[in-house]
């Protein structure tokens, strides 16, 4: 399983971006707008000029932000329950040691500072991932496993969260960034037919569709 001890299962940054958008699109399709506050995944294609951001939460103690920029990609995660006192959190200087300056600027964003950090992972070339693993538990195994690029992870997530048995082929299309159609929505959530609401949600996260 992916963790800061073994990053070999993380997809490349381009695949990761599609996968993250797909997770956010899945939440839009499965959870109506009036219940959007319970969604676990959101995506902002215009987080900063030329930069995009994916936000994830388990609804409790674990949170993660993935930042995509021309200079590379940074993944920051935290489990607030791992430490009794804030001063026991890992030093950000230790977590980012060796990180290129351009990516360190992303780590200084107000969203990351507010979230705090128990781990961070980065890539400059979009393929090779780096981190400075801590000796203590850091929640990376739980959080990174949700963005492994595998459509089956979507299916397992759906069984637990919605709950629903999501069709693998429909889920695979979301993971691959295939435009959402009415047929795809119906395959995932037969009860969902608020087309304008879905369209607006997908437009907001920059996910392609044919609605």
Regions found by a protein language model. Give the residues of each.
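Alpha-helical solenoid scaffolds in large eukaryotic transport, assembly, and signaling factors
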Residues: 73-75
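Short, solvent-exposed aromatic-acidic interface loops
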Residues: 78-85
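N-terminal domain-onset segments
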Residues: 1-61, 70, 85-211
